[in-house]
């Protein structure tokens, strides 16, 4: 004898269940997972190019150089174009190398130095530090994500409308939308992880 066929309503229930299993959304990529991903390498180094679009100028101001990061330890920032300047950011503050090769505390806290300190938090995935000053909105997944920072402190609201960071395994691009109508686009290239640092970077970071 042929086996009994299931009732139509049972068939519909099974079909609905199978469809729901195939269309379940993937778990959202969280800021904690992003932080862990960016903090995983022992070191990150590479090049950077920056374009600064100023309302008062027809063409962007372009700068570039090299950087080396030890997450949780320090950042060496070597601006090479259009002039040479070396900065480092560590827990004890921001320093600039003088003509004699000595590191001097950057007491003036220039805009460039403050920006480099922000990049240290961004590149190193220090979301706890970022959350002190910004509301974070993350989209995408571990392979391709975008993090939007909206200022929440009075100081940051005076400077930025928002900051948009994008990347994959590492940070690849940072866009700064500033209050005065200016805009900065920073791109990171030739990125390497867990490779020996240059002598200049080792000296700057005290290794």
What positions do the PLM features span?
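Short, Lys/Arg-enriched N-terminal segments with co-localized hydrophobic residues
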Residues: 1-9
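Short hydrophobic/aromatic-rich beta-strand segments that constitute the beta-sheet cores
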Residues: 48, 69, 75-79, 94-97, ...
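Well-ordered beta-strand positions in beta-sheet-rich domains
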Residues: 62-66, 86-88, 104-106, 162, ...
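Structural recognition of beta-strand segments within beta-rich domains
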Residues: 55-61, 66-71, 75-81, 86-89, ...
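Sec-dependent N-terminal signal peptides
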Residues: 13-22
């Amino acid at each position: 004898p042929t086996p009994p066929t299931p009732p139509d309503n049972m068939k519909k229930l099974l079909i609905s269940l199978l469809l729901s299993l195939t269309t379940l959304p993937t778990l959202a990529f969280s800021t904690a997972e992003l932080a862990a991903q960016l903090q995983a390498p022992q070191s990150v180094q590479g090049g950077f190019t920056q374009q600064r679009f100023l309302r008062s100028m027809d063409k962007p101001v372009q700068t570039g150089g090299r950087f080396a990061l030890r997450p949780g330890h320090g950042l060496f920032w070597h601006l090479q174009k259009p002039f040479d300047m070396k900065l480092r950011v560590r827990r004890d503050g921001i320093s600039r190398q003088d003509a004699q090769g000595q590191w001097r505390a950057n007491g003036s806290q220039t805009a460039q130095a403050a920006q480099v300190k922000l990049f240290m938090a961004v590149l190193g995935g220090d979301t706890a530090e970022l959350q002190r000053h910004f509301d974070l909105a993350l989209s995408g997944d571990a392979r391709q994500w975008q993090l939007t920072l909206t200022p929440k402190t009075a100081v940051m609201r005076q400077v930025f409308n928002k900051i948009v960071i994008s990347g994959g395994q590492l940070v690849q691009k940072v866009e700064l939308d500033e209050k005065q109508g200016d805009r900065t686009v920073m791109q990171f290239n030739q990125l390497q992880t867990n490779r020996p640092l240059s002598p200049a970077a080792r000296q700057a970071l005290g290794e």
